[in-house]
């Protein structure tokens, strides 16, 4: 936890796919001004005082790779430098970059093919090493850098990516994969798959001076019992399906943690689960409460809390209102070796969170900065994360609002 706690306060623009179970996708009419007066955020609890959050990071997902010019090594280096300069100017101290979104690699790998996101073709060598450049550019600016890995996903659908390289282990070992809803995923139950993921993690930390490894919320892709029936019958040894699946995920998480700490104890391992922990446990088969409360699984947990103040479901429940669910996470039992940070949804700027609550907060130009105040007055929360980079720094649709949010965040971090 030394690296995570050495950070002064966290803005983590993690590009995690918006998959939280309580999240709605409804979108209000578009506009690019912020003249509306939003409701004030809830008043802090009596006696609450502001404190510096310990970590501030910017993360980039595969969805945001359009901000990079990958036409040449020089062009890529320049665009990475520009991005990281903006992070520093805002007051951030860490970047989290997605390096394996689809069983591929944004770096030179002996295990996984080059990502199609660099050249347009999976397996095609771009002629330079994006991760090596990003590590150098980050560290030259005193930014920490974490490599973000999606452990199981090979294809989101038949178009993403459209074609797998011949060298892809999902093709050379097709028996390691399972289809689900048009996508393709490694089978979490197989020891061979768990070894591949651990080996892939170690390849990154052994070859690159990254400061951490992060997994996002994508573990099991479905609750359908038919997804892994053959493996269940062969390997479950009488255990109930949900329990068995959670044990498979727990085994992977602990194996990755143990391997990292055996090789490079200072490298952090964290997971960014959904903000709705019921979904984590029952749909993703992720026992986040165990990881938080038990040493030896993770260094930090960063739930994706992408809802606004007062967020309300159609059934009238406001459990996932920002001010309530962040407190829910802060109240969960947590081992002293595990840190807690919160993910914030920059992609909601100008769009809203789809709840039954007042949406004008997302047109205020300072909603995320208000959230930083709430987090800084919530004991147990040590940092924050914003999904996602280009929605704050290069927002083509709501640029004026994003600039206002960025300015408010910068001022808040400098105060």
Can you describe what each PLM-predicted range is?
Residues 294-323, 328-415:
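Substrate-binding cleft of secreted/luminal carbohydrate-active enzymes
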Residues 107-119, 153-181, 217-237, 356-361:
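Aromatic- and acidic-residue-enriched segments that line the glycan-binding/catalytic groove
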Residues 47-78, 146-147, 152-207, 357-361:
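Active-site-adjacent "subsite" loops/lids of carbohydrate-active enzymes
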Residues 90-126:
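Aromatic-lined carbohydrate-binding/catalytic grooves of carbohydrate-active enzymes
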Residues 76, 93, 141, 170-294, ...:
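Polysaccharide-binding and catalytic clefts of secreted carbohydrate-active enzymes
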